[in-house]
Amino acid sequence: MNHSRVQHEIEIRHCATLAEYDECVCLEHLIWGEDIAVPSAIFVVAHHTGGQVLGAFDAASAKASDKPKMVGFTLALGATKSGKPYLHSHMTAVLPQFHNRGVGRRLKLFQRQDALKRGIDLIEWTFDPLDLKNAHFNFVRLGAIARKYIPDCYGVTQSPLHAGLPTDRLVAEWWLASERVKSILADNPSPMKESAQRVSVPANLAEIRNTDRETATRLQTLVREQFQQWFAKGYAASGVESRPGATDYLLEPASTIDGLRLPKLVES
């Protein structure tokens, strides 16, 4: 599949009908299974309470049917922190056959543009710190940072995605109007400081999770403890770097991140 053609033929827009919300739920089932799917009623609530429901539609599929096929979506909930509105982006999903085509990034960029138009300068979401591909996307491609770690955020689930491990999560903060984010989105990031601290995750962790739960649990606990120690000292995760056999999270004092002036972290 040609990447540039996909970029041209994928339309990103707001979803606003029950049928489109049902399509989002169908994508959840296809990608993650039915056990952890969010029902369509939550999409309705998000739409009517200041959240976002965004869809990615394949225009090429309309040639074979009466309407474009949804191939991805983003669901965000409206929230406030210290009296200021922000968005909690609960999930972004893209069909596997459309991975590595820029669809997820386009959804996030549309989400950012829409939020800024509404006077919102912060979007947060949680992600698995052991998911290294997602970490690269969040920090390197989008310019998010993280300074909060939630152990077992959603509880242990039966989903094969979690391999029976606690659902530990990092909280990504995406400061939409910051110079850091603007520079990274323009492919002009500031170099990481040589003094950055590191939290290492084995490159083959996905395989370990599926074959050796005891080792995976031990590694998860080690990663959790390191993040909690650095965050307690006022550090933030702001990048990732791959090397043979491992990927390193890069952490620096939150007050010194180039192009970003962070408010005090508010615990929720």
Language model segments and positions:
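Aromatic/hydrophobic pocket-lining residues that form π-stacking "cages" and hydrophobic walls in ligand
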Residues: 111, 135
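A conserved beta-strand-loop-helix scaffold within acyl/acetyltransferase catalytic domains
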Residues: 11-95, 238-243, 254-255
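Conserved GNAT acetyl-CoA-binding A-motif
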Residues: 115-128
